[in-house]
Regions:
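Flexible "cap/lid" loop of the alpha/beta hydrolase fold
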Residues: 87-118, 380
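Conserved Class I S-adenosyl-L-methionine
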Residues: 143-166, 174-178, 212-221, 404-467
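Short beta-strand/loop motif that positions the catalytic acidic residue
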Residues: 184-186
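Class I SAM-dependent methyltransferase Rossmann-like catalytic core
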Residues: 228-258, 263
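Class I SAM-dependent methyltransferase SAM/SAH-binding core
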Residues: 273-321
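A short acidic, Gly/Pro-enriched loop at the edge of an enzyme's catalytic core
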Residues: 322-332
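A short glycine-rich, Lys/Arg-flanked "PGG" loop and its adjoining helix->strand segment in the class I
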Residues: 345-360
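Conserved class I S-adenosyl-L-methionine
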Residues: 362-386
Length: 467
């Protein structure tokens, strides 16, 4: 195995670790933009799978893994020996499976065998054209792929590592498999891994699938922008919108109040944790209903909720929840926040540890279809919202019983595109994009050209009980 740093600074606290595919090294990934606050390293050449390559890595608050092609199966083997100091918090699979050569779950065995036996300089070039989806796109990546090229003997040895007799996975439904992978991206035009086989593989363990047009070599920039959260940017955007949030975020305010209306508890919780309190809409609802409860808040924004007394912890909730005492809280609340997390699944697993037996967690988030107007912009990036079924799967994996799950739909109408863009700014909803002004301008221009000014929200309410 080999590792190359694409980006590294002693001041960063997060790591993006990319497991590349066969015959492709770090050169391919030099073209992409990466979010601030992350070191970025690329791993390739899985002839010998060993965690020795990670021995010199320093401590990180959080590590996000994007594994592509044969890198998926490789990381699936390596993750159990990944140093704990890296704090793995998200694993994304891209056009690959944990059983890479399999007639039902990966590359069919006869195709793999033919590729291996016929490997040559000529066939390798043909393979590279296929991963690009054809000659036109291959032209865009030809120079990078040429730089990646290793000698044929070495590439053959690397490929033999994945032969069925050496790398077959039978334990598809183990708890460990279900707790590792957060999402799987599948390109519908993949000419290497059959898309239907990939769907079979990920459906077996309940991993949420995101399907998109494209080839085996996907739009990595879009994937990076979609799944890797720039937490500092999110915090800045919500800090700047804090004073205007309650006046303009009518959908989010309704969702927070509706969540409390759905909450039922036989006894008043003594210790309550709220994640992402923002301006304090839900916080005040909790304090009014349970005036004796001791409240703890975690938020990326720097200001504690107004009108309430409690303990405020400033920072990333996905990191801080790992540092709080187990079985300490009676209830956990979060309104309109968990969609910003890298891993809602791991959050639920950690939340279950914090709750006493029988404790409950109440979440409001958003379902697929939310802000679909933004995703229609050229180059627009939206959050990969989870469906109610995906949330229920993650809840069961984490040890929760689903007490209530309810979805609504709300469409906001604006008299002008400028008003819509202003709404995004004043509510912090545009916190995912790196260039909010540019993205808002594109959104305004797009909607005005169609004569429409709407934003769609699908609030999702979830109440879970620890078993």
């Amino acid at each position: 195995m080999k590792l190359h740093w694409q980006k590294q600074s002693s001041e960063t606290t997060r790591l993006l670790l990319i497991f590349s595919g066969w015959s492709v090294d770090w050169h391919l990934f030099a073209r992409y933009d990466y979010p601030a606050g992350y070191d970025v390293a690329v791993v390739w050449d899985y002839t010998v799978l060993s965690n020795d390559i990670f021995a010199d890595l320093r401590d990180y608050d959080e590590t996000v893994v994007i594994a592509w092609s044969f890198g998926v199966a490789s990381f699936n083997v390596l993750h159990q020996s990944l140093p704990s100091r890296l704090n793995l918090n998200c694993a994304i699979a891209v056009n690959g499976t944990i059983s890479p050569v399999d007639d039902n779950f990966g590359i069919p065995e006869n195709i793999f065998s033919a590729t291996l036996s016929g490997l040559s300089d000529v066939s390798l070039k043909g393979f590279q054209r296929r991963i690009c989806g054809g000659g036109n796109r291959y032209k865009d990546f030809k120079d990078d792929l040429t730089l990646c090229r290793d000698d044929i003997t070495s590439l053959k040895n690397q490929l033999e590592t994945f032969s069925p007799e050496k790398h077959r996975v039978e334990t598809w439904k183990t708890a460990e498999d279900k707790r590792l992978w957060d999402r799987a991206f599948i390109s519908t035009g993949d000419l290497i891994f059959p898309p239907d086989n990939m769907k079979n593989a990920w459906n077996c363990i309940g991993t949420p699938i995101i399907s998109a047009e494209g080839s085996h070599l996907p739009d990595f920039q879009h994937i990076i922008d979609t799944v890797v959260r720039d937490k500092s940017l999110i915090g800045q955007q919500f800090n700047s919108s804090n004073k205007t949030y309650e006046k303009h975020a009518e959908v989010q305010i309704h969702a927070a109040r509706q969540l409390m209306a759905l909450w039922r508890s036989a006894t008043a919780p003594a210790q309550v944790l709220e994640i992402g309190p923002g301006s304090g809409t839900l916080s005040r609802e909790i304090a009014t209903r349970y005036p004796e409860a001791k409240l703890t808040w975690i938020d990326l924004a720097e200001t504690s909720p107004s009108g309430c007394n409690g303990t405020f912890l400033h920072g990333d909730a996905e990191i801080i929840v790992k540092q709080l005492p187990n079985e300490y809280f009676d209830a956990i609340f979060s309104a309109n926040s968990v969609q910003w997390f890298h891993s809602p699944m791991r959050f639920l697993i950690n939340a279950a540890k914090l709750l006493k037996k029988g404790g409950k967690i109440a979440l409001s988030t958003f379902a697929p279809g939310t802000l679909n107007e933004i995703t229609e912009i050229n180059g627009g990036t939206s959050l990969p919202y989870l469906s109610d079924n995906e949330w229920q799967h993650f809840a069961k994996t984490a040890g929760f019983e689903t007490e209530k799950i309810k979805e609504e739909k709300s469409v906001l109408k604006f008299t002008s595109g400028r008003g819509l863009a202003d709404h995004l700014k004043k509510t912090g909803v545009n916190a995912l994009t790196k260039s909010p002004r540019k993205d808002n301008f594109a959104l305004m221009r797009n909607l005005m050209s169609r004569g429409e000014c709407t934003l769609t929200f699908n609030p999702l309410y979830i109440i879970l009980k620890k078993q």
